[in-house]
Curated annotation (Swiss-Prot):
PANTHER family: TWISTED GASTRULATION PROTEIN HOMOLOG 1, TWISTED GASTRULATION PROTEIN HOMOLOG 1-A-RELATED. GO terms for biological process: regulation of BMP signaling pathway. Interacts with CHRD and BMP4. This interaction enhances CHRD/BMP4 complex formation. Interacts with BMP7. Pfam families: Tsg, Tsg_N. The N-terminal domain is sufficient to interact with BMP4. GO terms for cellular component: extracellular space. Belongs to the twisted gastrulation protein family. The keyword Chloroplast does not apply. Coiled coil: none annotated. Keywords: Developmental protein, Glycoprotein, Secreted, Signal. This is Twisted gastrulation protein homolog 1. Its main location: secreted.
């Protein structure tokens, strides 16, 4: 027989989840569900800034932590985003990792693996094509007014050998994950950089890649 306390806790959880579902039409549930549920259960995000009550704002922000920007609308703490205009898959955050281990990354991505990730390789020239067009645009439009535009010297205009096609190898994890977990996972496999899409898809970028890998989401269980 269930105790009254357990029944009350279950009812409270159901009520909180129903309230969340009602107020999170534009919410990125794939990314935010776990953390939002935790904060709601702890009753740290119950106030409504839109109605002039921000008594819990600080506690709610601390609870959501690094996911505040992406998830504050899920708990009614900020204005809802219109994801139809800018879908999360079209935006991403990139960062270089300070201590890559190229030999480890190559070893983990050689041949077929039964792990929960997808290995994708493509020509470095393809990786750079979008960036090259952007740099050319910046250099030619209103040139007298843009003398201070800086262009990275280690990729676009550097000599590029066509004797052997260089390949950029990246790894997409199958499941959604937080940006913090994405960074840790890519570090643990020796990647040089990582790209975290705002739908929570994680891409680890190998040492042969010149820029930041692919801009296309290819996480099997985290596509939207």
């Amino acid at each position: 027989m269930r105790s009254p306390c357990a029944a009350l806790s279950a009812s409270l959880l159901l009520l909180l989840l129903l309230l969340w579902a009602r107020s999170s039409v534009g919410c990125n549930k794939a990314l935010c569900a776990s953390d939002v549920s935790k904060c709601l259960i702890q009753e740290l995000c119950q106030c409504r800034p839109g109605e002039g009550n921000c008594s819990c704002c600080k506690e709610c922000m601390l609870c959501l932590g690094t996911l505040w920007d992406e998830c504050c609308d899920c708990v009614g703490m900020c204005n809802p985003r219109n994801y139809s205009d800018t879908p999360p898959t079209s935006k991403s955050t990139v960062e270089e990792l300070h201590e890559p281990i190229p030999s480890l990354f190559r070893a983990l991505t050689e041949g077929d693996t039964q792990l929960n990730w997808n290995i994708v390789s493509f020509p470095v020239a393809e990786e750079l094509s979008h960036h090259e067009n952007l740099v050319s645009f910046l250099e030619t439009v209103n040139q007298p007014q843009h003398q201070n535009v800086s262009v990275p010297s280690n990729n676009i205009h550097a000599p590029y050998s066509s004797d052997k096609e260089h390949m950029c190898t990246v790894v997409y994890f199958d499941d959604c994950m937080s940006i913090h977990q994405c960074k840790i996972s890519c570090e643990s496999m020796g990647a040089s950089k990582y790209r975290w899409f705002h739908n929570a898809c994680c891409e680890c970028i190998g040492p042969e890649c010149i820029d930041y890998g692919s801009k296309t989401v290819k996480c099997m269980n985290c596509m939207f």
